[in-house]
Structure formats: structure tokens, C-alpha cells
Amino acid sequence: MKIILPLMIGALLGLTDPAQARTLDAIRESGALGLCAHPNALPFASKAGNPPGFQIELGQALAHELGVSLRPDWIITQYQMRSAGCDIVLDVIADREAQGETNLKISKPYYRTGVALAVLPSSQLSSFKGLDERTKVGVLVGSIAAMTLGQRHVPTSTFGFEIDSLEALVNHEIDAAAVTPTMASYFNQTHPDKAVRILDLDESEPNLSWNVAVGMVRPDDALRNAVDQAMERLSADGTVERIYHRYGVTLQKPK
């Protein structure tokens, strides 16, 4: 199973009760689209709202396309999703296996991401293939990167959050950090004096790259089609790219 940041993928989210699911007509009748998001997880989302996070901004744009407003449903753990009653989750892995038991329905993908290596500007590393028993890599606990590197006997240092791994990197405690390009890019934007070099995704490692989509909680066909069409419009007119760029993130096209 592919693992990424909390609330970035549906694999970490619990099922809502089927009775809580709403159709497109019900969403339009209520006037609001519910988005489950973490209240303190920039660049993804922030309840404080300064900045709001790209999930909130994209959620607002998507809701506008559907003719409604956005209602953020703030959750911290997977268990809260059962009672939150949200309609969508953003930045989920577009892979049924990765969704586990969430049963989230997946839109067409709108960008590609994964786990990349962040290194110091002076590092000679250029890919995962360059890692060996002499390079220590920061990984998230229980992540696919941790498992992949462990199988190769690459020394790792475990962290609970990507920001901690990046801080350890700039403090010369590790040689590289296995993180999402999203978080590394935002780190560079907010720490210009400590900017790291982000290596390209290694597509030769199939478990370390994936497409990203909108996760929908038991939608009807009308909602699925409406979300797909809305996201296609927002991608075509540059809205999606502009939103992520405000957080220092350059999107890659899905494959």
C-alpha cells in the first residue's frame, strides 16, 4: 500500500456512514460542498486561514464550479471522518489499492507526485539508485519509502512529520530526506535561507510515484461526472496550477 501525508490520501481516512453521502442534487440544494481537511497542515490546509492552504483554495474553486460554496469539515484523525459528513477529500492517491477500505470514489487525476529525495545543494546524490550503506535517509514512520530503503539496507532515520525530516537535513543530521515534492517545495518557499535541492521523481520505483485525484464519499454518478468536468476546466484554464504555485509547488502532469 502506498502511504503519504495524513489527509493527503484516502488510505488514512475512515469510511463515512452510507446514509451521510449526498448526491449532486442534495449538495446543490444545501448550497455547500463539504471538504474534509486537517486544520493545521500547511501547505495543504489551515483553519487559521492565513494562508488557507491549497486544498481550501482548490476546494473553493471546485465548489464554485458546482454552483455552491465550500464548507470545510475540520478533522484530525480518521475516526472523525465518520461524523464529519464531508463530500470530498483532496490530494488522494488515484489508486484503488491505496484507498484500502475507504471506498472513496476517485476522480480523474489532476497531477502527479510521490516520494522524492531532498538533499543539500552540495550533495552529489542524483537518484534513489545512488543511496547505499553510507547514506542516511530521513523517512516517515511506516512509509513505503521506509520499507523500500529498508529492503536495500540503506540506513534510515525515522520521523513523524516531513518537516522534521527536512529540518534534520538542513542541520546535517541526515544525508537526504525522502519526502513529497509538495512539502519540500513549500519548505523552500518558507525557508529561503535553508533551501534544499529536490530531485526528480524516480519513475523506475513504481511504488514511489502516483497520480493524485479528488476522493468522493459515495457520490452518485452525477456528482462524479460534475467533479471530473469541473476539475478538467480548472486544470485547462490554469487555476489548479496557479493555486499550487502560490505555495511554491510546481505540478507535474498525471501519467
Predicted regions and their residues:
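Periplasmic-binding protein-like
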Residues: 38-39, 111-119, 188-232, 248-255
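Extracytoplasmic small-molecule ligand-binding "clamshell" domains
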Residues: 21-93
